[in-house]
C-alpha cells in the first residue's frame, strides 16, 4: 500500500469513528433529556390540581461526560401535616416532680436589660415549650420601672420566649395585655389579650398572628382571664373569663374558640361561688380547671368544661388540706366538695391542683398567710373525701422564708401519656421589699416524674442591694 492509500485509509477510519462518536453523543443527549422530562411528568401534578405530599421513590440518572452511570434511589421526606391536638392519651403516673427550668431573670437584670414582668406562665406547642409574662413596658434598670406594682396600665404587653430564655430586649411582644391566656391547638397559637379601661376593657383574640375576634367587658368591672394556658381539643379552645366584683358576686363565662373565632359562650353553672385565674388542663374529652375563690373559700373551685355540648359543672376540691393563701393551718382547716369552706376566703392567690384517681396533687405556699415558700404533695383521697388530710410525697420547691407568688399548670404530651408540669412565680421588689421601687419576677418550673428525685430549694436568689433602685 503506497503512502497515499495509507493516508486515505487512516482518514476514512477516523471519519467513521468520529461519526460513530457523534451519533453516540446525540443518543446520550436524547436519553438524558427524555429521562428528565419523564421524571417531571411522573412527579408533577396537572395544573390547578392539589397533590398530597407522600413518600415516593425517585429515579435520577446522573450523566458525567459521555458515560451513563448507575441509577441511584432517593427517598423523598415529606413534612408531617399539622393536626389538631386531641389530648386523648392517659395522664402519666408520677411519684412527684423533677426540676425542669429556671430563668433567673432578676439576677441577670443586675447586669443587663431584662423586662419588668409579672403574671408569668408556660405553654407548649407540639415541639417546644414557651414562657409568657405580662411586661410593664420597661426594663428593671430604667426609671420607668418605678411603681410597677400596678396591675393594669396601657403599657403592659404579653411577652413570649422559648422556655429558659429571659425576657431580654429582643423579646417578642405578642399583644397589648394586662391579663392573658395562650394555647396551641396543634396548628397555631391562640392568644387572649385583655387591655383598656377597667370599666370598658377589650379582649382581643389573636390566632396565627392575626386578630380574628374581640369582645368587650360585659360587667364593666375589670374583665380578666386565666394568667395561664388555655386548652384546645380537636380545634376547639376554651378559656375562662371573669368580669365583676373581685371580692363578691362576679360574672364568669367560658368561651369556646375555633381558630380565633368565638363560636359559643357558656355561663358558669354549678356550686362554685367565685372563680378567677383558673389553671386548666386537658381531661379528655373535656377540660378541667382549678381556680381561685377570692370571696368565700380557701378551698379551690373546680370548673369542668364539656367541649361537645358546651355544658359547665363547677364544684370545689374536696381535700381537707386546702390550697389557697391565706388559709387556716392544716390541723384546723376544713373543706367541702360542693361549697366554699368559708375560711379565710377573702383575697387569695392563683394556684393549681389536678386529680389522680381519687387522690389529688397540689401546690401551695408554705406560709399560711403570705406568699412565702412553696411546696407540692399528694393528698390520698383528696379528690373525693373532704376529710382527707393524709399528705404523701411532699416536696419543698422554695424554702419558707423566700418569696413565691402565682403558680399554674401546663400539660406536655409524651409518646404514651400526658404529663403535668407547673411553674412558680418568684416575685421580688415592692410592696414587700422596699429597697427598690420596682416589682418583677423570675420563674422556676418542675414536671411530673415516675422516677426518683432529691431535695432542694430554688428561690429567685437576687441580692436587691446590688440592683437598680
Please give the residue ranges for each predicted region.
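Single-pass membrane-anchoring alpha-helices
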Residues: 2-38
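Aromatic (phenylalanine/tyrosine) cluster motif
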Residues: 22-23, 40-42, 205, 410, ...
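Membrane-proximal alpha-helical anchors
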Residues: 32-51, 80
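Serine/threonine-rich low-complexity intrinsically disordered regions
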Residues: 52-77, 174
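Beta-rich carbohydrate-recognition and catalytic domains
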Residues: 79-113, 118-129, 133-173, 184-223, ...
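Beta-propeller and closely related beta-sheet repeat lectin domains
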Residues: 120, 179-181, 226-229, 276-279, ...
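Surface-exposed, short loops/turns at beta-strand junctions within beta-sandwich domains
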Residues: 232, 414-418
Amino acid at each position: 500500500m503506497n503512502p497515499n492509500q495509507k493516508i486515505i485509509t487512516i482518514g476514512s477510519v477516523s471519519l467513521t469513528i468520529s461519526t460513530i462518536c457523534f451519533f453516540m453523543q446525540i443518543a446520550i443527549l436524547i436519553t438524558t433529556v427524555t429521562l428528565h422530562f419523564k421524571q417531571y411528568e411522573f412527579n408533577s401534578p396537572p395544573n390547578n390540581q392539589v397533590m398530597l405530599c407522600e413518600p415516593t421513590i425517585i429515579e435520577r440518572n446522573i450523566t458525567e461526560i459521555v458515560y451513563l452511570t448507575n441509577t441511584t434511589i432517593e427517598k423523598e421526606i415529606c413534612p408531617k401535616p399539622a393536626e389538631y391536638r386531641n389530648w386523648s392519651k392517659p395522664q402519666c403516673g408520677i411519684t412527684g416532680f423533677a426540676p425542669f427550668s429556671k430563668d433567673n431573670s432578676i439576677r441577670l437584670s443586675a447586669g443587663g436589660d431584662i423586662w419588668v414582668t409579672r403574671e408569668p406562665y408556660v405553654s407548649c406547642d407540639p415541639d417546644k415549650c414557651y414562657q409568657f409574662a405580662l411586661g410593664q413596658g420597661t426594663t428593671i434598670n430604667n426609671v420607668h420601672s418605678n411603681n410597677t406594682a400596678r396591675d393594669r396600665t396601657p403599657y403592659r404587653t404579653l411577652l413570649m420566649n422559648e422556655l429558659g430564655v429571659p425576657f431580654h430586649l429582643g423579646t417578642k411582644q405578642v399583644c397589648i395585655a394586662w391579663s392573658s391566656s395562650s394555647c396551641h391547638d396543634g396548628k397555631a397559637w391562640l392568644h387572649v389579650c385583655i387591655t383598656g379601661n377597667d370599666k370598658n376593657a377589650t379582649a382581643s383574640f389573636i390566632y396565627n398572628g392575626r386578630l380574628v375576634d374581640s369582645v368587650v367587658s360585659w360587667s364593666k368591672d375589670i374583665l380578666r382571664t386565666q394568667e395561664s394556658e388555655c386548652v384546645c381539643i380537636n380545634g376547639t379552645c376554651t378559656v375562662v373569663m371573669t368580669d365583676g366584683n373581685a371580692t363578691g358576686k362576679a360574672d364568669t363565662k367560658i368561651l369556646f374558640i375555633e381558630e380565633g373565632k368565638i363560636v359559643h359562650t357558656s355561663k358558669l353553672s354549678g356550686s362554685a361561688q367565685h372563680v378567677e385565674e383558673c389553671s386548666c388542663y386537658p381531661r379528655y374529652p373535656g377540660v378541667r380547671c382549678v381556680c381561685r375563690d377570692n370571696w368565700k373559700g380557701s378551698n379551690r373551685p373546680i370548673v369542668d368544661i364539656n367541649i361537645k355540648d358546651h355544658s359547665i359543672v363547677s364544684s370545689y376540691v374536696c381535700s381537707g388540706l386546702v390550697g389557697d393563701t391565706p388559709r387556716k393551718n392544716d390541723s384546723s382547716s376544713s373543706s367541702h366538695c360542693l361549697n366554699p369552706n368559708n375560711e379565710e376566703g377573702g383575697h387569695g392567690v392563683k394556684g393549681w391542683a389536678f386529680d389522680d384517681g381519687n387522690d389529688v396533687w397540689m401546690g401551695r405556699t408554705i406560709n399560711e398567710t403570705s406568699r412565702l415558700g412553696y411546696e407540692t404533695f399528694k393528698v390520698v383521697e383528696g379528690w373525693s373525701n373532704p376529710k382527707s388530710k393524709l399528705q404523701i410525697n411532699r416536696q419543698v420547691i422554695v424554702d419558707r422564708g423566700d418569696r413565691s407568688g402565682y403558680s399554674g399548670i401546663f400539660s406536655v404530651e409524651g409518646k404514651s401519656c400526658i404529663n403535668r408540669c407547673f411553674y412558680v412565680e418568684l416575685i421580688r421588689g415592692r410592696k414587700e421589699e422596699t429597697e427598690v421601687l420596682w416589682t418583677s419576677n423570675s420563674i422556676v418550673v418542675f414536671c411530673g416524674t415516675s422516677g426518683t428525685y432529691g431535695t432542694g430549694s430554688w428561690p429567685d436568689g437576687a441580692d436587691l442591694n446590688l440592683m437598680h433602685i
